[in-house]
């Protein structure tokens, strides 16, 4: 015997409301009692099922009830239905006690079915069909009944779930409420009956879901880790952290500056410096200069890094923030020049230095000129650290790879990484294709590399500003307005 469960789970933080709808063989009642009877437990089932056929309203069974009055109809009663596969089920509802019972005992249902056919044939001009499966009146009426009652039940259950969700939450804020409804069948012979939808229906539903997703994608940000949706309006205030799993998603350079630097203290440097096409890089898809212009319009930036001076908890700092949204944060001649000028300014003014790394490496469109930036920046850092004895902190975010990792990304006095950051010199795909070896999953994640001693701290975004402030004060950099 099959057993069907309908689980409706509503979560709101620590609150859990579960409506378990299970099967019982003792709660069968006649369908005519859907209007008259209050007692769902009636023993003389055969007799009562036959009396159903005696009602004149059977011919209008498709108008028996609608979605509006289904609550009264199914409040505490049982009725017989037949699905499109020919399986007979007795269904029992008790909304007040959250009970939804389905029974498909084959021996019992066969007896009910034969009784049903006999009485339906009697109604059809008083004749009895020898083969009820070919009774056109019976098939048409039962098909209409099945479709109508299934749609009414579905509509009612969905409306009840929505109403319960609203009452429990006290608001329509869906960010704290998650409704999960599932129907599963515990049966050894459910593979054929599990999905009766046609391929055309599935394609239409998938197309509809895709259209809805595309229509509202500007309202949500999907997590790369758990694939949960985060409301974009509050995403920035939560520091681009996933509400479901806490995963650190990518941040723009402007958002990072706003997060780290005190309001009203940011002074950008070299904003008018833009890339040209020094080696006249040829591309069949799009010229390099046009691609630069496209990213400038898309991001509102002139290059893949923002540099400037600001205050962090009242402490003057020089900071460079790379932006992965601009050509993958790749390091070209302008990126290298802006960072070098910032380091030279910090050396001259004796300022602590922060560089937030988010890059795919050197920019191939500029050839060897982009590789030269590694040596140029490293040389400026040597003077800053070794000769002037100043304090430099790189912050490695996801991803930090290639020439950035091989140069200033790993030259800090104290190296900080974000949780779950992807940090590598060569990417996983490049290593596997070059060496023909499999790179283990997680071997280039911040947590694994931290255990190998590659950097000093893993700091989440929430306490990052206070951690930097303490490090600067430990190295004798104090706020200007300290009382």
Curated annotation (Swiss-Prot):
Broad enzyme group: transferase
Annotated localization: Plastid, Chloroplast stroma
Set out the biological process GO terms recorded for this chain's protein: fatty acid biosynthetic process; malonyl-CoA biosynthetic process
Catalytic activity from the UniProt record: N(6)-carboxybiotinyl-L-lysyl-[protein] + acetyl-CoA = N(6)-biotinyl-L-lysyl-[protein] + malonyl-CoA
Any one GO molecular function term: zinc ion binding
- Zn finger (C4-type) ranges are 223-245
Task: List cellular component terms (GO).
Answer: acetyl-CoA carboxylase complex; chloroplast stroma
Q: Entry's InterPro entries?
A: AcCoA_carboxyl_beta, Acetyl_CoA_COase_Trfase_b_su, ClpP/crotonase-like_dom_sf, COA_CT_N
Describe the task this protein carries out.
Component of the acetyl coenzyme A carboxylase (ACC) complex. Biotin carboxylase (BC) catalyzes the carboxylation of biotin on its carrier protein (BCCP) and then the CO(2) group is transferred by the transcarboxylase to acetyl-CoA to form malonyl-CoA.
Names of required cofactors: Zn(2+)
This one is known as Acetyl-coenzyme A carboxylase carboxyl transferase subunit beta, chloroplastic
Annotated family = Belongs to the AccD/PCCB family.
Claim: ATP-binding is one of the keywords in the record: yes
Q: What do we know about how this protein assembles, alone or with others?
A: Acetyl-CoA carboxylase is a heterohexamer composed of biotin carboxyl carrier protein, biotin carboxylase and 2 subunits each of ACCase subunit alpha and ACCase plastid-coded subunit beta (accD).
Show the SUPFAM superfamilies listed in the entry. ClpP/crotonase
Might you give the EC number(s) for this enzyme? 2.1.3.15
Bound cofactor: record note? Binds 1 zinc ion per subunit.
- UniProt keyword terms in alphabetical order: ATP-binding, Chloroplast, Fatty acid biosynthesis, Fatty acid metabolism, Lipid biosynthesis, Lipid metabolism, Metal-binding, Nucleotide-binding, Plastid, Transferase, Zinc, Zinc-finger
Query: What organism does the UniProt record list as the source?
Result: Guizotia abyssinica
Q: Where is the CoA carboxyltransferase N-terminal domain?
A: 219-483
